[in-house]
Amino acid sequence: MPGVNTQTLYGWDMEHYFYDEMDTEEDFFKSTAPSEDIWKKFELLPTPPMSPSRTLDGDWLFPIPGDRLGWAPPKVLTCDEEYEGLHKFDPLDIFGNLGSIVIKDCMWSGLSTSHRLEKVAHGERAPVAALIQNSTAQKAARAASGTPVTGSQAAQCVSPAAVLELPVPHKKVAAGSSGSECRSDSSDDDEDDDEIDVVTVDNRPKRGRPPSRRTPVTITVSADPFGPCPKRFHVSLHRQQHNYAAPSPDTDPEDDFEIEPVSKRPRLESSSAPSSPLSSPATSDSEDSTEQRRNFLERKRRDDLRSRFQALREEIPGLSGSSKTSKVAILTQATDYLLQLHSSQRRQAQEKRKLKAKQQQLLRRISALQNS
């Protein structure tokens, strides 16, 4: 298999990474894969400096709508802190080439070997170091002469919107008529630091209930736990000792009619008849009469049953004097007494037949004596 030839394509000058025959004298594991050198790509150029301080008047103070919200960009730390610590330069001196530096820093190098990376790193750091030295000298000269920063120098600044076009939504919500004030400057999760004041005013307490006390409480919420800009909300909370016997203060006055006792329901329905067409006085009267008739029949049945048991108890010889006999005992004793009555009735019927036969015999004897 022949070696990979990289002299064609886009004219890149790259070395061979795969070879036909592996040299046994050289350690194969000393070579590093392209993915292992990815962190060295960040050492090519320093991270772009922070935005200049807004000390001028006019439109240069707010290049983008986000600056009007009091947005302060977080401090960007470079990967090579030692390099930045040794060279402190003025951002105003390199604004002429700021766009190209940002674009070059965002685009990673396509070289894959450590040898080429070191060459590019040394080649790029040399002009940057010279530029930093020149900017330091110019800054010292301005400080000695006391020349203030003019608008022409600030005009050389590159707007972040020109390099990174990121739309920032800007929306304000007007305050409502209920007395609550709400200010929302952006709908994104990572929006700027906002402070929303919510004030609840209750001027008319409900009838028969003590006025509730509302205390404003500040709550700090951070959408990003590692973000430097938490959100503060002023919320009016309702603090009241719970009384479970009293109705809830948030319920409507119409709900009080639903917890009335059942005995007062006919009067409420009859009084609210003109407002609701479904309930009428005739319907309520018919329901009341039906319920009264049912109750009357039930009471009459119970009274009749009680009187019957009392009468039955009086007929039984052994239970006539006891007033606390149960119904089961009364029924049992009544059954036994009834059986006794039936047996005595049969015995008396037999005696009656015998007496009647004897009577017939005596009548025939009397008639025979008369004929003789």
Curated annotation (Swiss-Prot):
GO cellular component, one term: nucleus
Compositionally biased region (Low complexity): 269-284
A GO molecular-function annotation: protein dimerization activity
Record note on quaternary structure: Efficient DNA binding requires dimerization with another bHLH protein. Binds DNA as a heterodimer with max.
Region (Disordered): 172-226, 243-306
GO BP, one annotated term: regulation of transcription by RNA polymerase II
Renumbered residue ranges of the record's region Leucine-zipper: 341-369
Organism: Danio rerio (Zebrafish)
Protein's name according to its UniProt entry: Protein L-Myc-1a
Broad class of the protein's primary localization: nucleus
